[in-house]
């Protein structure tokens, strides 16, 4: 049996999630990612952040959303950090990605 990981999400992700997805689309994504935690591309120099393309509102992956997430597989967790439409943001900066990882790591140490 394939290992399934716990999906956790930041308040920022929660805020935007249902803007882009129906509840059904969201559940489909979470199930896929829980079974395939390394499906997205690793973002260079980001401290372990990954990005995956996913459909939104019937548009294909290229016109859908980008989901930014962070694996803590040794703890059995995948953290959904944020998501955005390709039309809104082309790429998050290295500095933004590093700040997301720092904030997440700080929360683990609290």
Regions found by a protein language model. Name each.
Residues 71-110:
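Enriched for short, Lys/Arg-rich terminal
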Residues 43-82, 88:
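Basic/aromatic recognition patch in beta-strand/loop cores that engages polyanionic ligands
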Residues 9, 25, 29, 61-64, ...:
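Amphipathic alpha-helical interface surfaces
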Residues 6, 14, 51-53, 109-110:
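Localized chelating/binding microdomains
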Residues 1-24:
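Arg/Lys-rich, positively charged N-terminal/basic patches that mediate binding to nucleic acids
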Residues 36, 47-50, 100:
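Juxtamembrane/interface motifs at transmembrane-helix termini
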Residues 12, 21-41:
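Compact soluble domain cores
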